[in-house]
């Protein structure tokens, strides 16, 4: 297994987020052409094969890909510069998303894809550990205050990951998912990131939102060939966000504790 260097970026020596946003590699889907090479091309084609499959359960992702709305960040490794690169790209994405007009056709999702050199693991749990390590490192370099109204502890139903002042929902997808195929976007580990508010608009705790969620969860069960995870729920209604970031293969109760800790806690 080539996962990530334990403690490599922990403690002192955190990289600083580039305030100017220079060297950020936020790539628009519409910019991707034949010049995309190597593992970037492999990863993009894997993702395309999923999101053009009519059976893929997330209709919002399929719509975004069909309309070339998806944004990408490709991460080469797990060093300081790689975290800096990802942080700058994520900051640009947050800035792009701040003035969202509420329309589905301007709801740009972000897919962060990691090379096999950054992480190659043997299990879903190991990929999740890497994903949480990345989120912890992003939190460490984020100079923006945590948004008011969002709890700082992931064991609260009112917590979500935040970056550059924006609450986010993050989906960890990995090649180790053999049962939950809807969380497998191909040969590379990926974080699928959206602003938290979009789920409240399209699939929140309203009659129409509950209908959307029910439809998607039915599609998940058919696509995966197994009932959807017990941990799936709506923000602020008792379900824990962090458990939905990384789903386990089995349908079971979970008693594990989120590895994310708020800076200074």
Swiss-Prot record:
Its cofactor is heme. GO terms for molecular function: heme binding; metal ion binding. It comes from the Bacteria. GO terms for biological process: antibiotic biosynthetic process. InterPro entries: Uncharacterised_YqcI/YcgG. Signal peptide: none annotated. Disruption phenotype: Cells lacking this gene do not produce cycloserine (DCS). Keywords: Antibiotic biosynthesis, Heme, Iron, Metal-binding. Involved in the biosynthesis of the antibiotic D-cycloserine (DCS), a cyclic structural analog of D-alanine, used as an antitubercular agent. Could catalyze the production of N(omega)-hydroxy-L-arginine (NHA) from L-arginine. Belongs to the DcsA family. This is Putative N(omega)-hydroxy-L-arginine synthase DcsA. The gene is dcsA.
